Amino acid sequence: MASYALQRLLLMIPTFIGVTLIGFFIMRLAPGDPAELRAAGGLGGATGAGISVEKRMAVDEAMAQWRAQYGLDRPLHVQYGIWMKNLVTLEFGESFKDNQPVWSKIVERLPVTIKLNALSILLVYLIAIPLGIYSATHPDTWSDQALTLFAFVLFAVPLVWAATMAIVFICGGDFLYLFPPGGLESLDYSQRWPFWRKMKDQAWHLFLPVVLMSYDGFAGLSRYMRASMLEVLGQDYVRVARAKGLTEKVVVLKHVVRNSLIPLVTILAGILPGIIGGSVIIETIFSIPGLGQLGYESVLARDYPTIMALFSVSAVLTLIGILISDLLLSVVDPRIAFGRRE
């Protein structure tokens, strides 16, 4: 197991380089010039037609100096090489938007996004697995059909629409005020509050964003669990266990569920990047100061250093998620022995 984990960690290096290389060139090919945005803000927006020749020359000179300062006037492969060299020392440079160190901005916001994603993944599995077990043990009943219909409806609801409707109807819009419309803390939040009150306030703010980030995940995952269990329930060893007189509860929980979890562990690697992508929408709509909101603002500002830093963090988290899901397979199914050859 240890040797396999080491091999996978080493293979993550070329994978990471390939992912960041593609992301780097796609980002630079996107429309919009950060130098023009910078010059427009610094010179009063005088970048359009109808300004004086002197003003136009001042704008062009400012943009040329700014591009040279950040190396944007160099070939793309040279820019990527410089970026990769700085990445080794975690030197992501300064943000184009506010000249703040990119790494400090990420470190400040990373715990919020990790908390949201961790709670969302936990909620997805806590809801999806019991729903899948119930549907598989009650196939083709009205409750199974209702759960299937409910899951497909949830899976089809766009996250942007669901979050907007939640704010309008239950977050102090025109109807109810059950949850706060944004942020992580109340306006009267104080560090002098007792621990339980701080936890209660944060849970109140996190509940709705976590649920919204999770609903399509547990809707789809519950269907995977149902299909996997139905397949396992038809195996010969399940019939043998029943023939030995074992109760249905023991058969399901001891023999069926564990083998049914193998596909769900594999799917974990695909859920993680999807939830990270969903955090961009949720953090932006609910004004949560996480990496998703930072990424959205950086894209609008063409903040290349911040975008690439966030892209790198997301790539690393995704690769780690894939590795963890592979290692968990050996825990769920002891027959799997990674790195061994017969």
Predicted feature locations:
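Alpha-helical transmembrane segments of integral membrane proteins
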Residues: 2-3, 110-111, 115, 119-143, ...
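N-terminal signal-anchor/signal peptide hydrophobic helix marking the start
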Residues: 6-12
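Residue-level recognition of pore/gate-forming positions within transmembrane alpha-helices
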Residues: 12, 20, 43-44, 125, ...
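Hydrophobic alpha-helical transmembrane segments of membrane transport/permease proteins
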Residues: 16-78, 170, 174-198
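Hydrophobic membrane-targeting alpha-helices
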Residues: 21, 25, 29, 165, ...
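An internal, D/E-rich "acidic patch" concept
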Residues: 67-129
